[in-house]
Curated annotation (Swiss-Prot):
Gene that this polypeptide is encoded by: ZER1
Coiled-coil ranges (or none): none
rRNA-binding recorded as keyword: no
LRR repeat intervals: 226-245, 246-268, 278-302
ARM repeats, residue ranges: 427-467, 511-556, 558-600, 602-643, 714-756
Tissue specificity as recorded in UniProt: Expressed in testis, spermatocytes and spermatids (at protein level). Expressed in spermatocytes, spermatids, prostate, skeletal muscle, ovary, small intestine, heart, brain and pancreas.
Example of a GO biological process term: positive regulation of proteasomal ubiquitin-dependent protein catabolic process
The entry's keywords: Acetylation, Leucine-rich repeat, Repeat, Ubl conjugation pathway
Stated name of the protein: Protein zer-1 homolog
Organism of derivation: Homo sapiens
Length: 766
């Protein structure tokens, strides 16, 4: 079962401070520059958390705006101490690192910070005496500086600049540096000379860097415990160097199988060398490699029985010489992952759910190209089979979507996987907190990636949630995104259909403040434009019907939205739809329901008082469409118009008396036990028609409506009628001289129903 644990006080305080920087930690010096309050001192635990959480909020939160001078809060180590920070994406620029250059950083991770230039290399020197861990993964421009080819020093003259590779920077002076990640650097960075000054490297990541001569790695053969050479084109020479690094505990020579043609194949001899020469090895990743058949035993030879991780039983022959099982073995898109006996506690691969989840976990941060394919496999598992590690799967997909907000493949596969992982089959296993995280990343995807497949997947995933309840915490944002999707210039019918359905659900069963806010966002106008487009195409489909239904819901007891409907030619569209689609019963019901809402607004009723409109409403009294619904709603519209009295009847034809007679006839033709396709949140608009004598037919319609609802749905509507004070009003009708006898009889029956209901449900326990 799912359980919700509250956020820690530290997490809540951090979030609040970051969202209110100039009201908590700092103040604005000149309307834009942040400064820390002079009486504040923050230790490293708090400062590190503030910076790392800030980066997370900028990259993952929808409603969080980065502050240009945020890093200036940490410029003075006498009041703030930074030690371990992780920065990513375009958020970080040269001036941000410059702002914190006086800090004694121990750990600095810069991931895909493409806006950093060679200026930041000089800033890095400021941390040289304290830095132990440094990652420059994906910072592809940090070894470039701009050069003015004209040699002109006047910065106001327009001269094009070109980027020049910095070749004289080295890690000279970084005496404490032990962990270094240079993954995804450009190929022509002189890695060997760059690294030569580092005497005691323990971990090195050269992912994606090509070097034909790896002999320089041997200078750390007595210290290097982790080496990552992902997507490096290997040769026998590389292998000869690697096996000299006898202290290695983690070796990653995996590759992206789809990246390029690759001649090197892992042989039985190479794997045997790793086992023999690298005796401390605990983790090995050979994902994506072609493996020669002589590396494994045949299916026929594999030992029967339960799978084993004991090296002696290994289906991979060279690994039988291992002293103990590996902690991790990367075999994603590698034929060895399908063997039965693999000597490792954790295996990444594509054979089963466990291997696929291990792959997503291992590769998400730095290898989106691999992660997207692993998530695609998870999608198939969730779609065709059953996901047995649901919570782990959901958390991993959420992390991947947060981490790679602008990666199309991740967004497509991740949003598709979420659709299956959040469906009703798995619902009881998910906490409110986790489901909210899903909603956040889905909305992030819709916001960041305007692509048809992503948008469709995200909309479908939102359909798995209880609407509007589960989306209420992001109510405004989700409506804005859906309305942008419904822009009529977009032609994708399937997305339109899902988005209109969601919009309709979002404005159903919410309070009037929400409806008014959504109306001001352009909801009413957007729906009318969709209807207009469908009319031009002479098409009455789900989009058309959902659009009218959404308008019916959003105008319920919301006068501003009703007025908007009238102001933007809503009545013309109503008449045109009625004429173009005379047989569409569902459409007629939705349109008349909406007009019932408009008619409830006294100030707007004069706009309905035209011969054309009154004639249309009168004719619809005889409609048998959708049971009694169209006739009932048409009568409701006319009841409110009649309620304004004879003096408000501003048309000669049809005459008021004639319409009144048709209304009486229609009401008498309805079956009082009719099941209804309607949902009243309040009886207030009906109840206001009871205490009056100016229009007995309106009073009768209102009484009939109450009698029908309390008869057919007593559990729902008896308490509502009692709560809203309907009983005294009905008793007054019985005493009224102007009320018709049949109306009085009906009022008595309503009172009787509600009285019986109260007695039956009275609690007599002691």
């Amino acid at each position: 079962m799912a359980s919700d644990t509250p956020e820690s006080l530290m997490a809540l305080c951090t979030d609040f401070c970051l969202r209110n920087l100039d009201g908590t930690l700092g103040y604005l010096l000149d309307k834009e520059t942040l400064r820390l309050h002079p009486d504040i001192f923050l230790p490293s635990e708090i400062c590190d958390r503030l910076v790392n959480e800030y980066v997370e909020l900028v990259n993952a939160a929808c409603n969080f705006e980065p502050h240009e001078s945020f890093f200036s809060l940490f410029s003075d180590p006498r009041s703030t101490r930074l030690t371990r920070i992780h920065l990513r994406e375009d958020l970080v620029q040269d001036q941000d690192l410059e702002a914190i250059r006086k800090q004694d950083l121990v750990e600095l991770y810069l991931t895909n910070c493409e806006k950093l230039s060679a200026k930041s290399l000089q800033t890095l020197r400021s941390f040289s005496h304290t830095l132990v861990s440094l990652s420059l993964f994906g910072c592809t421009n940090i070894f470039y500086e701009e050069e003015n080819p004209g040699g002109c020093e006047d910065e106001y003259l327009v001269n094009p600049t070109c980027q020049v590779l910095v070749k004289d920077f080295t890690f000279e002076g970084f005496s404490r540096l032990r962990f270094l990640n240079l993954g995804r650097m450009i190929d022509w960075v002189p890695v060997e000379s760059l690294l030569r000054p580092l005497n005691s490297l323990a971990a090195l990541d050269l992912s994606g860097i090509q070097t034909s001569d790896a002999a320089f790695l041997t200078q750390w053969k007595d210290s290097l415990v982790s080496l990552v050479l992902y997507n490096m084109d290997l040769s026998d020479d590389h292998i000869r160097v690697i096996v000299q690094l006898h202290k290695l505990r983690h070796l990653d020579i995996s590759r992206d199988r789809l990246s390029s043609y690759y001649k090197f194949k892992l042989t039985r001899e190479v794997l045997s060398l790793f086992v023999q020469k690298l005796g401390n090895l605990m983790s090995l990743d050979i994902s994506g490699h072609m493996i020669l058949e002589n590396c494994s035993i045949s299916k026929m030879e594999e030992e029967a029985g339960q799978t084993s991780i004991e090296p002696s039983k290994s289906s991979i022959i060279p690994f039988r010489a291992l002293k103990r099982p590996l902690q991790f073995l990367g075999l994603f898109e590698n034929s060895l992952c399908r063997l039965t006996h693999i000597p490792a506690y954790k295996v990444s691969g594509d054979k089963n759910e466990e291997q696929v989840l291990n792959a997503i976990e291992a590769y998400t941060e730095h290898r989106p190209e691999i992660t997207s394919r692993a998530i695609n496999l998870l999608f198939d598992i969730a779609r065709i089979e059953r996901c047995n590690q649901l919570l782990r799967a959901l958390k991993l997909v959420i992390t991947a979507l947060k981490c790679h907000k602008y990666d199309r493949n991740i967004q497509v596969t991740g949003s598709a996987a979420l659709f299956y992982l959040t469906n009703s089959e798995y619902r009881s296993e998910q906490s409110v907190k986790l489901r909210r995280q899903v909603i956040q990343v889905v909305l992030n995807g819709m916001e960041s990636y305007q692509e048809v497949t992503v948008q469709r997947n995200c909309c479908l995933t939102l359909c798995n949630f209880s609407i509007p309840e589960e989306l209420e915490f992001q109510y405004r944002r989700v409506n804005e995104l859906l309305l942008s999707i419904l822009n009529p210039t977009r032609q994708d019918e399937s997305i339109q259909r899902i988005a209109v359905h969601l919009c309709n659900a979002l404005v159903c069963q919410v309070d009037n403040d929400h409806k008014e806010a959504v109306g001001k966002m352009g909801f009413v106008v957007t729906m009318l434009k969709l209807i207009q487009k469908k009319l031009l195409d002479k098409t009455c489909d789900q989009v058309m019907e959902f659009s009218w239904s959404a308008l019916w819901n959003i105008t319920d007891e919301t006068p501003d939205n009703c007025e908007m409907f009238l102001n933007f030619n809503g009545m013309k569209l109503f008449l045109d739809c009625l004429k173009e689609f005379p047989e569409k019963q569902e459409l007629h019901r939705n349109m008349l329901g909406l007009l019932g809402n408009v008619a409830e607004v006294k100030e707007l009723r004069p706009q309905l008082m035209t011969s054309q409109f009154i004639s249309v409403f009168s004719n619809l009294l005889e409609s048998k469409a959708d049971g009694i619904e169209v006739s009932y709603n048409a009568c409701g519209v006319l009841s409110h118009i009649m309620f304004d009295g004879p003096e408000a009847w501003g048309v000669c034809e049809p005459q008021r008396e004639e319409v009144e007679e048709r209304m009486w006839a229609a009401i008498q033709s309805w079956d009082i036990n009719s099941r209804r396709n309607i949902n009243y949140r309040s009886f207030e608009p009906i109840l206001r028609l009871l205490p009056q004598g100016i229009s007995p037919v309106s009073q009768h319609w209102a009484t009939w409506a109450l009698y029908n609802l309390v008869s057919v749905y007593p559990d729902k509507y008896c308490p509502l009628l009692i709560k809203e004070g309907g009983m005294p009003l009905l008793r007054d009708i019985i005493k009224m001289a102007t009320a018709r006898q049949e109306t009085k009889e009906m009022a008595r029956k309503v009172i009787e129903h509600c009285s019986n209901f109260k007695e039956e449900n009275m609690d007599t326990s002691r």
